[in-house]
Design a protein with these regions (language model features):
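A structural boundary/capping signal
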Residues: 1-115
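Intrinsic low-complexity, glycine/proline- and repeat-rich
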Residues: 111, 312-315
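Intrinsically disordered, low-complexity N-terminal regions enriched in serine/proline/glycine
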Residues: 13, 19, 62, 85-88, ...
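A polyanion-binding, active-site-adjacent surface
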Residues: 116-306, 310-313
Length: 315
């Protein structure tokens, strides 16, 4: 990857969430780099090495990179000036910068977003299912939640969902879809919101016909596990039969045989649940006990209903 490509990708990832705390209220899309210099310097250092340097600009601490006798500064435009004096700098180690917990957390969030964006590029360039699917217009296949310990795994992009709205579980009018309403009722049982969770689709593009689901699932599996390896969730809730078949990678006769059980798949704990579509009579009723028994606390999974260890199925 070249520097200009990294700069372009990062420019689409900056947000209030990754902005330095004292700058959050001033952050906006017209000044995306505001409050990002330290974590961006760390990421540039991850990919290109060199030195991380610190200067003062208008009495404000500012970080940039020095690579092969070249100054690299992706966030200089936040100062709205071309006259930055880079000469009087001090070298800073990664350890010195990351000792601050807030900086470390923001760095990890931005780095994760970057890695997932690079995987999205691979998905967008994939042509394995070209005659069977329509691509995501936004090339975005991950709904980034506030906490990464739980991932909701859907079947495939719905025609009226986030492939058009750009926001998982919402339509183009930003109205929660019927399946989202049911899912939120279930998440209420464990004190979470849809926005708290990461959301992925087992199939990354929109299948033009359901008969292609199995083939597309096979082709997309490598991308799914690339994403999961970066997110590192503690639990994955797979919605319905198709998503479950894709991730479990073994055959079962009836979906009811696996619902609510915990499977260890490549180090990830997967719990199949009924799809929250309100069309299904089991969308809430069939999942209620599963959610009541699921207690995600301090990033660990405890199955608390039966006062005994639940069997973990390993494949």
């Amino acid at each position: 990857m070249k520097l200009d490509k990294l700069e372009k990708i990062l420019n689409n990832l900056y947000s209030k969430e990754t902005c330095y705390p004292t700058c959050k209220n001033q952050w906006n899309n017209d000044n995306k780099t505001l409050g990002h210099c330290a974590i961006v310097a760390l990421i540039i250092n991850d990919y290109f090495g060199g030195d991380i340097c610190k200067i003062k600009v208008n009495d404000i601490s500012h970080y940039f990179n020095h690579i092969n006798d070249k100054i690299v500064d992706f966030t200089s435009d936040q100062f709205k000036t071309d006259k930055i004096d880079y000469s009087n700098y001090v070298l800073k180690t990664r350890e010195e910068i990351l000792i601050n917990d807030d900086t470390r957390i923001r760095y990890e969030i931005l780095k994760l977003k970057l890695k997932l964006s690079l995987i999205d590029e691979k998905i967008h360039d994939c042509s394995a299912c070209s005659c069977m699917v329509e691509k995501f217009p936004s090339s975005k296949t991950v709904s980034f939640g506030k906490r990464r310990d739980i991932v909701i795994l859907g079947e495939a992009p719905a025609n009226n969902g986030w492939r058009k709205s750009g926001v998982a579980w919402y339509d183009i009018n930003h109205k929660l879809l019927p399946s989202g309403v049911v899912l939120q009722k279930l998440l209420d049982l464990i004190n979470l919101t849809i926005e708290d969770t990461f959301f992925l689709e087992a199939i990354k593009c929109y299948p033009v016909d359901r008969k292609y689901l199995n083939k597309c699932g096979i082709n997309c599996k490598k991308f799914l596990f690339m994403q999961l390896e970066e997110i590192k969730p503690k639990v994955i809730l797979s919605l319905g039969d198709s998503a479950t078949k894709t991730i479990l990678d073994f055959k079962y006769k009836k979906f009811s045989e696996v619902v609510g059980k915990v499977f260890d798949i490549k180090g990830f704990k997967v719990i199949p649940i009924y799809h929250p579509s309100p069309i299904s009579p089991l969308s809430y009723k069939g999942n209620e006990e599963i959610f009541k028994n699921l207690n995600i606390k301090e990033f660990e999974i405890n199955w608390i209903a039966s006062n005994r260890k639940i069997k973990i199925f390993q494949y």
